């Protein structure tokens, strides 16, 4: 069954996928309110009540002060320059880090996006890859279809030429040539 003129095979399936891919971008701007988006936002909001910090795993980081272990793990440049020989310097820094970490969940200072929230550049890259793949599929399908048509034309190539437009003119008679060709088929310009 032939497809309608305005709708090709791969585009018919890729259009809904493209719309689904753009839904998170639209919902972030407030253009598409949905129950799923609201539920996700409610589950991400911090719950009221006391927050407890998880204990440190046993190992080399347990012997170090909490602030130094976190900065060493994060690879912060200020971690090497901290002076632990001054008695009050380490405890003051630890106290400040503890106070700053109380408001955040898990006690971490760095704000990292959750796996569900994709940065805008990653969304743009995903859309670009999907559109490029759709264009690639379109041209591959188009090339395959064109080759099928060309094979049919080549198979009946002799019948396809227009005989009415062909002129048969006699060749000049040369005694030197042993050519047995009597007529030359010339195609006039169309």
Curated annotation (Swiss-Prot):
Instruction: List the transmembrane segments.
Output: 124-144
Gene from which the chain derives: Fam174a
Mention any one GO cellular component term assigned to this protein in its UniProt record: membrane
Topology within the bilayer: Single-pass type I membrane protein
- Topological domain ranges for the Cytoplasmic compartment: 145-190
Q: Which domain of life is it from?
A: Eukaryota
Protein's recorded name:
Membrane protein FAM174A
Q: Which UniProt keywords apply?
A: Glycoprotein, Membrane, Signal, Transmembrane, Transmembrane helix
Annotated family: Belongs to the FAM174 family.
Tagged with keyword Signal: yes
Key word Transmembrane helix present in the record?
A: yes
The residues forming the signal peptide are 1-31
* Topological domain spans for side Extracellular: 32-123
Recorded hits in Pfam families, A to Z, give:
DUF1180
* Annotated region described as Disordered, given as residue ranges: 37-119, 167-190
Q: Where does this polypeptide localize?
A: Membrane
Q: Which spans does this entry mark as compositional bias, Acidic residues?
A: 172-181
**Which residues carry attached sugars according to the database record?**
83
């Amino acid at each position: 069954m032939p497809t309608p003129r305005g709708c090709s095979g791969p585009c018919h399936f890729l259009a809904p996928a493209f719309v689904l891919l753009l839904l998170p971008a639209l919902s972030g701007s407030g253009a598409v309110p949905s129950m799923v988006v609201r539920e996700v936002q409610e589950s991400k909001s911090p719950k009221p009540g006391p927050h407890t910090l998880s204990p440190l795993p046993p190992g080399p980081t347990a012997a170090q002060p909490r602030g130094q272990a976190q900065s060493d793990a994060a690879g912060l440049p200020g971690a090497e320059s901290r002076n632990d020989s001054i008695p009050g310097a380490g405890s003051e820094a630890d106290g400040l880090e503890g106070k700053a970490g109380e408001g955040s969940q898990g006690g971490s200072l760095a704000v990292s996006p959750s796996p569900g929230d994709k940065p805008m550049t990653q969304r743009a890259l995903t859309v670009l890859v999907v559109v490029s793949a759709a264009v690639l599929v379109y041209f591959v399908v188009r090339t395959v279809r064109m080759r099928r048509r060309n094979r049919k034309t080549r198979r009946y190539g002799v019948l396809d030429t227009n005989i009415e437009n062909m002129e048969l003119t006699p060749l000049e008679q040369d005694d030197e040539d042993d050519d047995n060709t009597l007529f030359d088929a010339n195609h006039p310009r169309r």
